[in-house]
A protein has these predicted regions:
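Flavin (primarily FAD) binding-site architecture
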Residues: 269-287
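Beta1/beta-strand and adjacent pyrophosphate-binding region of the FAD-binding site
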Residues: 24-38
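Glycine-rich FAD pyrophosphate-binding loop
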Residues: 47-68
Length: 602
């Protein structure tokens, strides 16, 4: 009897051990919504960690918003480290780029110019472009941490200014302004819709990356080849599966596709920002995220590939690579002629794309052909066909990729790096350093996978309160370039001479005579646009004898302080933005081995 009882106990113990072993061995589950490169990366990384992953894609095929031709040309490891890591891991062969496609060139009134040609034939235009680049570099240098671009109130104020407004102040000659506008709208969006702080932050990220680094090799087949390699690794992919709802509870998440419900512990949302508004989420997104979905600016980009029997442009000009036009042709990408034929990819961007949205595909192509015909009379006769990619009118994306407008970094910076309970977010729009690029999509997928892993281990990604932006640092005034830039930007170009004129007023008194020499730091207050009387009253202001003087300055300072006020208004949102200061740290865990880089979309 005793032996029977012992046998029963042993069986119970074996059963308990087996059950606990099964519990330990049972893999975590996740659903990835969106089959662009961000979603594919997140699914691949989670599956590599032993997770059971299901990827749902609304369209008939995965791959996302990769371009027609630009995505074939990729940067080197300096420009796109993570992309190059995956290319090496999957043993994809890239072909070194010919030298003549590695630097941009120009098409001015139908005439082709390399950078060297421009310097000799149109020196005024070339000098103006250099002046613009130097001014932009001054701004970029003033951002010490591109992950926190609005680190002080002066930089924060740049977010309230459009790029177009800043370019107006540079007084560029017309042709140079047209070419610069075209470059900015091609890479981001229309200058009048773009935050100056965003342009400065992106320039800071790519400050040490040369144009030659961006076009270092060709990936035959483009980003679709990389997408295919991810697909080969993944076990469960369901296309034609548009998600309509996501419901979370304490035990997991249910994702609805029509009448079918998929269940998992966690979800990665890797869809374009606008597509989020079409998915009902329970619990619902907070007001700040809903505002971001509705108002965050997306760059408008349409790509038209025109096919010709033979090159219709001047055969003496070796036109190939990225060519910026000062006319309505936008940015041209001319493929090297193959088998006697020639392809031209024309990128219509910004407002050039917006005004074409009412046109059908054939009408749009005809409009572009009319413009080409004006410069190249053989164009229509040699034309054989076309391909189109119109991201701007795609309802699922609402544009090509993120391009922060004025005031939007202040409101939405790093907002999507914070998970919503069991849902993490990925996509080019969630990456701080390389939004709108292949590199940004890959980085965001890695970061989301790391966050989901962290959530399963009990890690929290709730925001932590961050200090408000620091006041602008006077020290930078001594650095000629930066001080001069901010001085001019906020109307201080006249403020510097004025203190000099005031100096004589104080000079009559022998004791204060040295004081006029000390005022040089005074121009640091130039954002306040001091009145003519200010320099004389500055000394009293420091001793605080009369508080009326500060009262007079107050109205002027309020103008400059307004951004700071608006910055404080969304106190919680600021916390939310800076909160991801921790998630990025986690993000660095997996991506750490790989730095950021750039080239197409998610």
């Amino acid at each position: 009897m005793l032996s029977g009882w012992l046998r029963a106990c042993a069986l119970v113990m074996v059963g308990m051990v087996s059950a606990s072993a099964l519990a330990v061995d049972k893999p975590h589950t996740a659903i990835v919504v969106g089959g662009g490169l961000a979603g594919l990366t997140a699914a691949y990384e989670l599956q590599s960690k032993g997770w059971q992953v299901t990827l749902l894609e609304a369209k008939p095929a995965v791959g996302g918003r990769s371009g027609l031709a630009g995505s074939e040309w990729i940067g080197n490891a300096k420009a796109q480290p993570l992309l190059n890591q995956y290319i090496d891991r999957f043993k994809i062969k890239a072909v070194p780029a010919p030298e003549f496609v590695r630097t941009p060139s120009y098409l001015i009134e139908g005439e082709y110019f390399t950078g060297a040609d421009l310097a000799t034939k149109q020196p005024a235009t070339a000098d103006a472009i250099k002046r613009y680049e130097a001014a932009l570099d001054d701004m970029a240098r003033s951002i010490t941490d591109p992950n926190n671009p609005a680190a002080n109130s002066t930089l924060f104020a740049l977010d309230q200014i459009t790029v177009s407004n800043w370019l107006d102040r540079l007084s560029l000659p017309p042709t140079a302004r047209q070419l610069i506008n075209q470059q900015i709208r091609t890479r981001y969006d229309e200058p009048s819709r773009l935050s100056l702080l965003y342009l400065a932050q992106q320039s800071r990220v790519n400050r040490d990356v040369d144009d030659r680094d961006r076009r270092a090799a060709r990936l035959p087949g483009g980003s679709a080849v990389l997408a295919e390699e991810f697909v080969k690794q993944l076990k469960v992919i369901k296309t034609n599966s548009p998600v309509s709802a996501i419901n979370q509870d304490k035990d997991g998440v249910t994702v609805k596709v029509g009448s079918v419900g998929y269940e998992a512990e966690y979800v990665v949302m890797a869809v374009p920002l606008r597509a989020l508004s079409k998915i009902q989420m329970t619990p619902a997104l907070d007001a700040q995220r809903l505002g971001a979905i509705k108002s965050t600016n997306y760059g408008w980009h349409d790509q038209i590939m025109l096919k010709f029997k033979t090159p219709v442009w001047d055969s003496k000009a070796r036109m190939s690579g990225e060519i910026y036009s000062n006319t309505g042709l936008g940015m041209l990408w001319i493929e090297p002629a193959l088998k006697g034929g020639a392809n031209v990819v024309i990128n219509l961007a910004g407002d050039n794309a917006r005004i074409m949205q009412a046109f059908g595909d054939k009408q749009l192509v005809d409009q572009v052909l009319i413009r080409m015909q004006a410069f190249y009379p053989q164009a229509r006769g040699a034309f054989t066909g076309y391909e189109l990619r119109r991201s701007s009118i795609d309802p699922s994306s609402g544009g090509a990729y993120l391009a922060f407008g004025p005031g939007q970094i202040s409101k939405y910076w790093r907002l999507w790096e914070r998970p919503l309970q069991r849902v993490a977010f990925a996509g080019e729009h969630t990456d701080t350093l390389y939004p709108g690029t292949l590199e940004g999509a890959l980085r965001s997928g890695q970061r989301a996978a790391t966050q989901v892993q962290g959530l399963s281990e009990g890690k929290s990604y709730e925001p932590v309160k961050a200090p408000p932006p620091k006041a602008p640092e006077p020290v930078k005034e001594s650095n000629g370039g930066i001080g001069g830039f901010f001085s001019n930007l906020f109307g201080g170009s006249k403020a510097e001479p004025k203190p000099a004129e005031k100096a004589p007023e104080v000079a009559p008194a022998p004791a204060p005579a040295p004081a006029p020499v000390t005022p040089p730091p005074a121009p640091v207050v130039e954002p306040a646009k001091p009145a003519v009387t200010e320099p004389a009253k500055k000394a009293p202001a420091k001793k605080e004898p009369a508080k009326k003087e500060p009262a007079k300055k107050e109205p002027a300072k309020k103008a400059a302080a307004k951004p700071a006020a608006t910055h404080k208004a969304p106190a919680k949102t600021d916390a939310a933005k800076k909160a991801p200061a921790k998630p990025p740290a986690d993000k660095a865990a997996t991506p750490a081995a790989s730095a950021p880089a750039s080239d197409s979309k998610n």
